[in-house]
Structures are given as structure tokens and as C-alpha cells.
Swiss-Prot record:
This protein's GO CC annotations: plasma membrane
InterPro entries: DUF2254_membrane (IPR018723)
Any single Pfam family the record assigns to this protein: DUF2254
Top-level taxon in the UniProt lineage: Bacteria
Record membrane topology: Multi-pass membrane protein
Protein name: Uncharacterized protein MT1328
Compartment(s): Cell membrane
Keyword Zinc: no
Keywords on record: Cell membrane, Membrane, Transmembrane, Transmembrane helix
Disordered, as annotated region: 1-25
Transmembrane segments: 68-88, 114-134, 160-180, 192-212, 290-310, 399-419
């Protein structure tokens, strides 16, 4: 697309852009992405690339909003129902044919009655569906986590069912004005339209049955956790590709020069997304550098520091007056956290389910253990991937843009810390955490990550020693900690099977403690 856009501006310009593209591809390294813009093509390349990328980012943002908007598909359903009803009402059916025998056979009064009954039934059904949907949202927020409401709102099957009901209602209601008499006094019955209304009524019955089936399964805790896990793993693959498994050389963000201009948050909210490509392209064409110091997912207040920007070159200086504003246009702040670029939010959703399960109101430690199992899948993948900041440079190595990402220790802390604190009185929850840490340690290559795992193991041991008065409970946790520590200290060691951390290990620890007490007695 880049060559096609530049081709209209001259063959020389297109060749220059293709050459720049080849040089950029050869000069890219594992540590950063490079943007090379020839001086002759800088204006056109910048205008095209920023516009195209901005449109793509806007489409992603709009799509993310529409996926969570319940009104979109029902609105399309109403439009389709009205349009198809108007078209089918104009289709004549020749009397006496096979098609005529399959169509609605009745008087204009019968046709009007059918359409009224279908319309009234759909209104009642839509009310029932809305009530059940609100009930499921209430269950999700009270039993699991209020941060899961967005997941339920994005549920496409619910939106499709509502769209079918809305389409049937609009189709039948719109068909009422077509039933009547011709100008010559003859009766007019839109047989095709009335038959279509009856067909849509049966489709709506099938949709209602499917909706009830889907709703009963969607509020199950296993289904909810699996959805959150899969979405989080999908984001991990997007931000940290699987092919990029080797740990990169750690880069330290540069210190902003004295005349750097701060990037201040225009309003309060959560940092949801950053259009990295837009800012990097603009910085490459304008010889500026931008550095963010705030993580995606953090809450910022109006006027709070997001980062810095300054002019690149032999004599750095303050950027032009429009550069900070252009950067801020591509830094999106909203009232809620999203999973577009925030892995920690996916971990937070799962942790919230565990904390709600461990609360005195529910007291369901097994659900918390299930959450830890799903967390281990995400944390193990993070342990096996390189987790660099998103750094963009030009071919000369000049920094264009720097977006920081949380470290592995931060991800591990988010997944373990609060569950350890709230589950410190249940030994099986702590052993599940140690099973998680053992699986994570098996995938760690970087020694610093093993240190982070060892720190979490030590914190679990301290919690067990502080909370458990029963020797068997304490022995079970300490034994699991010893097995996890062995995996940490011996790279290449496989994590023990889950049975060594669960109920079997608990029974063995209890029996061993009783035997020891009997011998001592």
C-alpha cells in the first residue's frame, strides 16, 4: 500500500521509499524496531503512514467499543427487519401455484392478527431476555468480580439473540401497514411477508432456547476463567511473540535532557492504549524523541506526568509547540481498564475471582485454587518469553519512542501477592501457589526471574509459618516449598506433578505428622 500511495507522486519517490523499506528491514534488530525515512520522501511518507496507521488504530478502538455495545446488533436487526419486510411485501405470488400453496392462507384480518401476535410476543420475549441478561450481570459482579462485566457485555451470542428478536418485532410491526385493500377495493394480503413473520417466530423460539442454554453455561465459573485466560494469553502473544523467546539485553531508558518538555495527562483516567507506530513515525519524520514513564493500565490524574519529549540531533532542544499535543492524541486515557494492551488487567480479573472466593461471604477456597491453576498457565508463558519495553529507533540508532512494559517480577507479584495474603489460612491455596511457582521456575531461563520466583516462595513459607498452628498443615506447605525451591535452584529440572501439591500430599503430610506425634508420645 505504501508503494501504491507514493507511486502517484513520482517514480523516483516510490523507488526511494522501497529502498528505505529494504534498509529498514535489514537494520531491524531484536532489541528495537527501526524507522528510516529518506529526506526526499519524508513529507509524503509521514503523511501517508501516520494517516493510515491512525485510521487502523481508530478502527481497533471503535471495534473494541462496538464489541461491548449491546445496542449495535439489535439496531442492525431492526433495520434489516424493516427493510426485508418492505421488500417481501411487494413480491406477488401467482395464485394456484405450488409456492402459493406453501404461503399463508388466510384473510386480511387473519394476516393482521398473526402480525400483531408475533409483535406482542417478541416484545415480551425481549423483556425476558433483558431481565435474564441483567440477572447474569448481577451474578457475575456479586459472585465473581465487577471487572468481569465487560466480558459479559462483549458476549456476541447474547447480542445476536437480541438482534433476532428485534428483527422479528420490527419485521412484523412494519408489515402491519401493508395489510389492507387495494385502491380498487380488492383485498391485499402480503403472503410472503406474513409467511416470513411466522418463520421468524420459529427462528426466535430456537434462539430463545439457545440463549437459555448459553446463559446457563456462561455464568459457570470454569467458563468465565477460561475466557479470561484465553484473552490474556492472546494479548501475551500479541505483545511478546512466541518466536521471541530469548531474553534480550536489558536496555535502560535514557534520562531526558534538561530542556525536555513533559507530556502531561489531559484528563484523569486509566492509560488504556498507546499508538506506538503513530508516535514513532511522527518522531522519525520530525526528528523528535518521546519517552513514556507510565505503564499502560496505570491511573493518571489530570496534569500528571506521562513522559517526556525533546528534539533529537547534535544540539537537542525543546520540541515544537505541536509535537507534545500530537503525541497526546495517540495516548488514550479512559475511565476503565481494558485488555487491549494491559496484561496486568487480565491477571487482575483472575485474581479478583480468587479474592471473592476467599472472602468470608463465599468461603470457597477450591475456586481460588482453580484460579491459581489458570494463572499458572499465563505466568508460565510470561516466564518463557522475552519481556522488553517497546523501543523504536531509526537506522542510525537514534531513539524515536520508548514505551515501558512491566517486568516479569511485576507480573508474578500481581498474580501471587493478594492470593497469598487472603489465602494464608488455607494450606491448599498456598500449595497451589507453590505449584504455580514451580511451573513458572521450570520455564525461567533468566537468573533474575528465578530470583523473583524464589522471593515469592519465601513469602509463602513465611505466611505458612505465621498462620498455621497445625504441624501437618505447616509440613505440607514446607514440603511443597522444598520441591518448588529445587526446581528454582536446578535449571532444567521438571516441576513435580500436581499430585505432590494437592490433596494427596495433604493426606500424606497429616499421616506423617500423626505418626511422628505417636512415636514421640
Amino acid at each position: 500500500m505504501l508503494q501504491r500511495s507514493l507511486g502517484v507522486n513520482g517514480r523516483k519517490l516510490a523507488m526511494s521509499a522501497r529502498s528505505a523499506k529494504r534498509e529498514r528491514k535489514n537494520a531491524s534488530t531484536a532489541a528495537s524496531k527501526c524507522y528510516v525515512v529518506p529526506p526526499s520522501a519524508r513529507g509524503w511518507v509521514h503523511a501517508y503512514s501516520v494517516t493510515a496507521t491512525s485510521m487502523l488504530n481508530r478502527r481497533k478502538a471503535i471495534l473494541d467499543y462496538l464489541q461491548g455495545a449491546v445496542w449495535v446488533l439489535p439496531t442492525f436487526g431492526v433495520a434489516i427487519g424493516l427493510g426485508s419486510g418492505a421488500v417481501l411485501s411487494m413480491i406477488p405470488v401467482k395464485s394456484g401455484t405450488l409456492i402459493d400453496k406453501l404461503m399463508f392462507q388466510g384473510t386480511p384480518g387473519d394476516a393482521r392478527g398473526v402480525l400483531i401476535v408475533v409483535s406482542a410476543t417478541m416484545i415480551t420475549t425481549i423483556g425476558i431476555v433483558f431481565s435474564l441478561t441483567v440477572l447474569s450481570l448481577q451474578i457475575a459482579s456479586s459472585q465473581f468480580s465487577v471487572r468481569l462485566l465487560r466480558t459479559f457485555l462483549r458476549d456476541v451470542p447474547n447480542q445476536v439473540v437480541l438482534a433476532i428478536f428485534a428483527c422479528t418485532f420490527a419485521y412484523s410491526t412494519g408489515g402491519l401497514h401493508t395489510v389492507g385493500e387495494h385502491r380498487d377495493g380488492g383485498a391485499f394480503i402480503p403472503k410472503v411477508a406474513v409467511t416470513g413473520s411466522l418463520a421468524l417466530a420459529f427462528v426466535s423460539i430456537a434462539a430463545l432456547i439457545y440463549f437459555l442454554h448459553h446463559l446457563m453455561h456462561s455464568i459457570q465459573i470454569d467458563t468465565i476463567m477460561d475466557k479470561v485466560r484465553l484473552r490474556t494469553l492472546g494479548l501475551v502473544d500479541q505483545l511478546y511473540p512466541e518466536s521471541d523467546t530469548a531474553d534480550r539485553q536489558v536496555e535502560t531508558p535514557p534520562s531526558p535532557p534538561a530542556d525536555a518538555v513533559p507530556l502531561l495527562a489531559p484528563h484523569s483516567g486509566y492509560l488504556q492504549t498507546v499508538d506506538v507506530d503513530d508516535i514513532a513515525e511522527f518522531a522519525a519524520a520530525s526528528r523528535y524523541t518521546a519517552l513514556l514513564v507510565t505503564f499502560v493500565g496505570d491511573y493518571v490524574t489530570a496534569g500528571g506526568l506521562l513522559g517526556w519529549c525533546w528534539r533529537r540531533g547534535t544540539a537537542p532542544g525543546a520540541p515544537g509547540s505541536d509535537f507534545p499535543q500530537r503525541c497526546l492524541r495517540h495516548v488514550h486515557i479512559g475511565f476503565e481498564r481494558t485488555l487491549q494492551q494491559d496484561i496486568r488487567f487480565g491477571l487482575r480479573q483472575m485474581v479478583d475471582i480468587a479474592l471473592r472466593a476467599l472472602s468470608p461471604a463465599l468461603n470457597d477456597p477450591y475456586t481460588a485454587i482453580q484460579v491459581v491453576h489458570h494463572l499458572s498457565a499465563v505466568e508460565s508463558v510470561l516466564a518463557s518469553r522475552a519481556l522488553p519495553d517497546d523501543v523504536r529507533r531509526d537506522r542510525a540508532g537514534e531513539l524515536l519512542f520508548w514505551l515501558p512494559y512491566p517486568s516479569f517480577a511485576t507480573y508474578l507479584h500481581v498474580g501471587c501477592a493478594q492470593i497469598r495474603r487472603y489465602g494464608s489460612r488455607e494450606p491448599l491455596v498456598l500449595t497451589a501457589l507453590l505449584q504455580l511457582l514451580s511451573a513458572v521456575a521450570q520455564n525461567c531461563v533468566d537468573p533474575s526471574r528465578r530470583v523473583a520466583v524464589q522471593t515469592q516462595i519465601a513469602l509463602v513459607v513465611r505466611a505458612a509459618q505465621r498462620e498455621f498452628a497445625d504441624e501437618s498443615d505447616r509440613a505440607m506447605v514446607l514440603g511443597a516449598a522444598a520441591r518448588a525451591t529445587e526446581v528454582v535452584e536446578r535449571p532444567g529440572t521438571l516441576a513435580p506433578p500436581p499430585s505432590t501439591f494437592g490433596q494427596v500430599a495433604a493426606a500424606q503430610a497429616a499421616a506423617s505428622t500423626i505418626r511422628s506425634a505417636d512415636r514421640d508420645g
